Amino acid sequence: MKSLSVSLVVLWLLLNWVNSQQNVQQSPESLIVPEGARTSLNCTFSDSASQYFWWYRQHSGKAPKALMSIFSNGEKEEGRFTIHLNKASLHFSLHIRDSQPSDSALYLCAVTLYGGSGNKLIFGTGTLLSVK
């Protein structure tokens, strides 16, 4: 029984170590586009075991709100917004069709990891979008 307890503790520590290694990067840091343009925001992640992939939008002075999520390879479209996910290349992106001034905001990508210490949502650094 003691051996099982030690094994479980080691497994828990390994899962936490793996979770702490996730790195989420966004590009570009900022983007200015004309009204009506097609806009692309990019996100890369370092752990292919990630489960859910999110885009959040935060308007100035407001809390971030979940915009869209995806969990399997391919694309998902909602109105003018499309998410593309390719787990093999550790990349997902948000595409905005017919950009509007109301789309101006900070966009944050995030990755959900499941592990021994619970679920973790790890955010990218953000892309500030200005539509002129």
UniProtKB/Swiss-Prot annotation:
Report a single Gene Ontology molecular function: peptide antigen binding
Q: Per the record, which residues fall in region V segment?
A: 21-113
Report if keyword Cell inner membrane is assigned.
no
- Enumerate the residue ranges of region (D segment): 114-117
Q: Where is the signal peptide?
A: 1-20
Q: What keywords are annotated for this sequence in UniProt?
A: Adaptive immunity, Glycoprotein, Immunity, Immunoglobulin domain, Receptor, Signal, T cell receptor
Glycosylation site list: 42
CDD domains xref list: IgV_TCR_alpha
Pfam families recorded for this chain?
Answer: V-set
Q: Where is this region: J segment?
A: 118-132
Give the source's domain of life in one word: Eukaryota
What GO cellular component is one of the record's annotations?
T cell receptor complex
One annotated GO biological process: adaptive immune response
Q: Has keyword Ion transport? A: no
Record protein name field: T-cell receptor alpha chain V region 2B4
What is the species listed in this Swiss-Prot or TrEMBL entry? Mus musculus (Mouse)
